[in-house]
C-alpha cells in the first residue's frame, strides 16, 4: 500500500512523510525552503514596473536596557498612506522565554515573519534540547529578513527590533541586549537603547537625553513611554496614548525570570503620570546638566 505522502507498508496511514524524518536540519526555515518554498515570506513577486500596493505599516518601536533586563515598547497605530488603518495593532511579541521582537514596516509581512521566527526557535529547541544563544537568535532573524529582500526592493520592507536577556552573559546586570537590522539582513547590536520605525528619529532623541546607566525597570518603562510620546508628538504615523479608548502602548519586559508583558492597567498608570507631567511641561522631561 502506498499513501499520498510516499509511505508504504502496513500502518502507513497517519505517519509523517519521509522528508520529516531527515536528520540534520535544525532550522525550520531551511526545512521549509527545501520542502515548501512557496510558504515562506517574500515569495510573492510584483510585475515589472508595478507599484507596491497600499498596505498597513507598523510605525515606532523603542527598547531600553536596564540593570538586569530590557524593556521594549511599541505604539498601537498602523497607517496606510495618509489613513489610519488600525488604532490598536500590537507590534511587540514574545519570541521565546527570554526574547521579544517589535515590528516596523509592512505589517502583514512583518507579522508573518514573526510567526515563522517563533516556530523557528521552538523547532530548534525541540530538536536540540536547548535554546539558541541570544546572538544565534538574532542571526536566525537576520537570515529571515535577508530572504525578504526581493519584497523590500519592491517597497514591502520589514524592519524589526529584537531584544532579550542573555542567559550566558558574564555580568547579569548587563544581560539585557538589543539588536537592530536593515532590509538586507544586516544585524547590529545596539548599546543601551534604540528605536525603529517612522518616529524613530524623535524617539531616539528622547532616549538619548533621558537614558542613564543606573536605570531600573520602572525607569526604563517610563523612559520608553516618554520616547513614544515624543515620537507621536512629531510623527503623524505614530499613535499617542488614547485615553478615551484606553489604548496604551504595548510594553514588554525581559529579565532573568523570562518574558513578561505589562498589563494595560499598569501601563495606563504610567501613561497618566506622563500626561499629567506634560500638562505642566508639554516638552516633557529634560536632561540634567552636570
UniProtKB/Swiss-Prot annotation:
It holds the Pfam family Proteasome. GO terms for cellular component: cytoplasm; proteasome core complex, beta-subunit complex. Transmembrane segments: none annotated. Disulfide bonds: none annotated. Its EC number is 3.4.25.1. It catalyses: Cleavage of peptide bonds with very broad specificity. The formation of the proteasomal ATPase ARC-20S proteasome complex, likely via the docking of the C-termini of ARC into the intersubunit pockets in the alpha-rings, may trigger opening of the gate for substrate entry. Interconversion between the open-gate and close-gate conformations leads to a dynamic regulation of the 20S proteasome proteolysis activity. It comes from the Bacteria. SUPFAM superfamilies: N-terminal nucleophile aminohydrolases (Ntn hydrolases) (SSF56235). GO terms for biological process: modification-dependent protein catabolic process; proteasomal protein catabolic process. One of its GO terms (molecular function) is threonine-type endopeptidase activity. PROSITE patterns: PROTEASOME_BETA_2. The active site is at 59 (nucleophile). Its main location: cytoplasm. It is found in: Cytoplasm. Keywords: Autocatalytic cleavage, Cytoplasm, Hydrolase, Protease, Proteasome, Threonine protease, Zymogen. Component of the proteasome core, a large protease complex with broad specificity involved in protein degradation. The 20S proteasome core is composed of 14 alpha and 14 beta subunits that assemble into four stacked heptameric rings, resulting in a barrel-shaped structure. The two inner rings, each composed of seven catalytic beta subunits, are sandwiched by two outer rings, each composed of seven alpha subunits. The catalytic chamber with the active sites is on the inside of the barrel. Has a gated structure, the ends of the cylinder being occluded by the N-termini of the alpha-subunits. Is capped by the proteasome-associated ATPase, ARC. This is Proteasome subunit beta. It comes from Acidothermus cellulolyticus (strain ATCC 43068 / DSM 8971 / 11B).
Amino acid at each position: 500500500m502506498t499513501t499520498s505522502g510516499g509511505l508504504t507498508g502496513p500502518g502507513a496511514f497517519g505517519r509523517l512523510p519521509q522528508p520529516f524524518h531527515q536528520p540534520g536540519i535544525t532550522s525550520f526555515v531551511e526545512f521549509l525552503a527545501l520542502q515548501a518554498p512557496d510558504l515562506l515570506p517574500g515569495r510573492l513577486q510584483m510585475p515589472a514596473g508595478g507599484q507596491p500596493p497600499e498596505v498597513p505599516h507598523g510605525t515606532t518601536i523603542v527598547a531600553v536596557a536596564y540593570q538586569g533586563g530590557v524593556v521594549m515598547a511599541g505604539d498601537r497605530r498602523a497607517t496606510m498612506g495618509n489613513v489610519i488603518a488600525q488604532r490598536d495593532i500590537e507590534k511587540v511579541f514574545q519570541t521565546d522565554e527570554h526574547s521579544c521582537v517589535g515590528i516596523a514596516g509592512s505589517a502583514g509581512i512583518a507579522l508573518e515573519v514573526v510567526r515563522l521566527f517563533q516556530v523557528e526557535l521552538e523547532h530548534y529547541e525541540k530538536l536540540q534540547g536547548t535554546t539558541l544563544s541570544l546572538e544565534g537568535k538574532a542571526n536566525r532573524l537576520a537570515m529571515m529578513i535577508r530572504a525578504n529582500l526581493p519584497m523590500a526592493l519592491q517597497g514591502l520592507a520589514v524592519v524589526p527590533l529584537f531584544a532579550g536577556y542573555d542567559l550566558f552573559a558574564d555580568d547579569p546586570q548587563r544581560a539585557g541586549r538589543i539588536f537592530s537590522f536593515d532590509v538586507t539582513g544586516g544585524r547590529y547590536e545596539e548599546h543601551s537603547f534604540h528605536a525603529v520605525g517612522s518616529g524613530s528619529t524623535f524617539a531616539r532623541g528622547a532616549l538619548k537625553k533621558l537614558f542613564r546607566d543606573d536605570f531600573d525597570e520602572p525607569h526604563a518603562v517610563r523612559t520608553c513611554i516618554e520616547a513614544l510620546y515624543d515620537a507621536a508628538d512629531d510623527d503623524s504615523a505614530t499613535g499617542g496614548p488614547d485615553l478615551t479608548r484606553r489604548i496604551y502602548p504595548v510594553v514588554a519586559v525581559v529579565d532573568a525570570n523570562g518574558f513578561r508583558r505589562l498589563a494595560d492597567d499598569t501601563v495606563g498608570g504610567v501613561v497618566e503620570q506622563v500626561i499629567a507631567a506634560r500638562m505642566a511641561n508639554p516638552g516633557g522631561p529634560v536632561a540634567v546638566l552636570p
